[in-house]
From Swiss-Prot:
Belongs to the ATPase gamma chain family. This is ATP synthase gamma chain. It is a peripheral membrane protein. Its main location: membrane. Gene3D superfamilies: 3.40.1380.10, ATP synthase, gamma subunit, helix hairpin domain. The lineage of its organism: Bacteria, Pseudomonadati, Pseudomonadota, Gammaproteobacteria, Legionellales. It comes from Coxiella burnetii (strain CbuG_Q212) (Coxiella burnetii (strain Q212)). Keywords: ATP synthesis, Cell inner membrane, Cell membrane, CF(1), Hydrogen ion transport, Ion transport, Membrane, Transport. F-type ATPases have 2 components, CF(1) - the catalytic core - and CF(0) - the membrane proton channel. CF(1) has five subunits: alpha(3), beta(3), gamma(1), delta(1), epsilon(1). CF(0) has three main subunits: a, b and c. One of its GO terms (molecular function) is proton-transporting ATP synthase activity, rotational mechanism. It is found in: Cell inner membrane. HAMAP family: ATP_synth_gamma_bact.
Amino acid sequence: MSKAREIRTKIASIKNTQKITRAMELVAASKMRKAQDRMAMSRPYASKIRKVISHVAASHAEYPHPYLQQRENIKRVGYIIVTTDRGLCGGLNVNLFRTAIADMKKWQADNIGMDLCVIGRKGEAFFRRYGGNVLAVADHLGDAPEVQDIIGIVKVMLDQYDKQQIDAIYIATNEFVNTMVQKPLVRQLLPLKTDEEEVEGGYWDYIYEPDESKDLLEMLLVRYIESQVYQAVIENIACEQSARMVAMKNATENAGQLIDELRLIYNKARQAGITQEIAEIVAGAAAVE
């Protein structure tokens, strides 16, 4: 019967764990919906500001802004890596690291150096071990970060670009496809390619003064980069909560299956114990007779 008591203890322990994973699943589902709402609200801003940049740049083509010009000799590139602060979100970070490293190896093959700015504690820990040149880290952003929280890390990378210490900037993040699918990707932030189709397809009857258009374009480009990084951060949060919800759901279901298996083992052990006791009683009665 001692074995049966051990099994009962295991069942009770797993039930407690199951309650925790179920609660975490519900919390993650709630946070995911909020993150999706923030993600949807920020997209129109980034889309509109890119259109404005395309028109302003086209109206003042004689002023080639450095953020819009492809550099011929690329000697060093920068990466902004967007990860999570916490774990328990499946293979979200691991898949992103694998994608980012695969992209970085293309530059390494050409002996091109790399600088990193990392968002999230998981990314910081990984690239400290991996050996990347981490310039800046932003962590503890929470579940509802503001644009101000990422301005510092963006400025570090833009300063490097302005000083020509790096010749291109890329961002590695997770794209939210749906609740079950999160896609790791790497895309180029700078130099920015203007939307030529948007310029040709629409006509804005605006007159830009040369000096003012330069200042406007400078401000818009910086704001656009900030908005892209912020969009990546909140989209990564939606991916994190979605992956955590799925992981906790699977953990809850696995706990239920394990409890069922242990109950079956417990019932068999209890039945064997009762059978043994009956056999001992019968044997004792027979000995008395």
